[in-house]
């Protein structure tokens, strides 16, 4: 592994532990050349997954794109980065469990909204307002009512 400090290819692992419920290995490394310590993460390489967008174009699945969209919806809300990462993990796991190589962006949006509804109501409404592109107040109110119904059933 190249040292990010001196760019030499001589490092040794000084600590290794599973993270992310065993799906990732966190390794603490030390460069044998300059002594710089750094962290790396190892995870299983997943098969490529393509997203079919609304206009029919295809692009590679991006965890970062989902994370950025959810983070924007959760701005100034009491939602931790750990919760956001877990949400994205859950969405990706549910997609991969389907065993498909392509998925519609609409399906991804629904999976995100399903997960987000359990985390924060306001973030859910924010995400839904962009994702569903509300054109009138009645569609917005319908989403609000659905959210309120979901809460009353949960109690």
Swiss-Prot record:
Zinc fingers, unnamed class: 3-34
Keyword Metal-binding: yes
Any Gene Ontology biological process: negative regulation of DNA-templated transcription
Pfam families in the cross-refs: ATP-cone, Zn_ribbon_NrdR
Domain ATP-cone: 49-139
Cofactor: Zn(2+)
GO molecular function: ATP binding; DNA binding; zinc ion binding
Keywords for this protein: ATP-binding, DNA-binding, Metal-binding, Nucleotide-binding, Repressor, Transcription, Transcription regulation, Zinc, Zinc-finger
Co-factor binding comment: Binds 1 zinc ion.
Family, as annotated: Belongs to the NrdR family.
The protein's name: Transcriptional repressor NrdR
Lineage: Bacteria, Bacillati, Bacillota, Bacilli, Lactobacillales
